[in-house]
């Protein structure tokens, strides 16, 4: 029986799984929205939400804990300088996982993972800049 095992193995070794989730976390923090498979997205939520909670309390110890998990200075800086203050009043649930259809090659269920309260990008400004 597999009672109380809260982790999906995702058909990977533990080191590969750790590296994959670390890379996906860094990508999500940098771009604020990523597209991946649904099981990976659900596991990513378990990794990123505690990191954002760490970012809400800016201390040296929390920065070191976040760096230990992310291993990227730019991601840690954004986590504490941008995302922590943005989610200061939200008690949890910082991510949204949206089902995004199925992948063409293998029909794997896809998902869009995004941070909530993202600043809206005005598309008319982008069109004017392109012209």
From Swiss-Prot:
State the UniProt keywords alphabetically: Ribonucleoprotein, Ribosomal protein
In the record, biological process GO terms are: translation
Q: Which GO terms describe its molecular function?
A: structural constituent of ribosome
Give the residue range of the signal peptide: none
UniProt xrefs under InterPro entries: Ribosomal_bL17, Ribosomal_bL17_CS, Ribosomal_bL17_sf
A GO CC annotation given for this chain: cytosolic large ribosomal subunit
Which portions of this protein are annotated as coiled-coil regions? Answer: none
Looking up NCBIfam families in the UniProt record yields: L17 (TIGR00059)
Assembly with partners or alone: Part of the 50S ribosomal subunit. Contacts protein L32.
Q: Which family does it belong to?
A: Belongs to the bacterial ribosomal protein bL17 family.
Q: Give the protein's recorded name.
A: Large ribosomal subunit protein bL17
Species annotation? Burkholderia cenocepacia (strain HI2424)
Q: Which gene encodes it?
A: rplQ
């Amino acid at each position: 029986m597999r009672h109380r095992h809260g982790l999906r193995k995702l058909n990977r070794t533990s080191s590969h799984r750790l590296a994959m989730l670390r890379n996906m976390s860094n990508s999500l923090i940098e771009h604020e929205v990523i597209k991946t498979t649904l099981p990976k997205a659900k596991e990513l939520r378990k990794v990123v939400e505690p990191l954002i909670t760490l970012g809400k309390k800016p201390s040296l110890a929390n920065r070191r804990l976040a760096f230990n998990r992310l291993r990227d200075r730019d991601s840690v800086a954004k986590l504490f300088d941008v995302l922590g203050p943005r989610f200061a009043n939200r008690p949890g649930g910082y991510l949204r996982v949206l089902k995004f259809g199925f992948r063409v090659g293998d029909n794997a269920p896809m998902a869009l993972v995004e941070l909530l309260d993202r600043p809206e990008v005005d598309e008319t400004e982008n069109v004017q800049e392109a012209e």
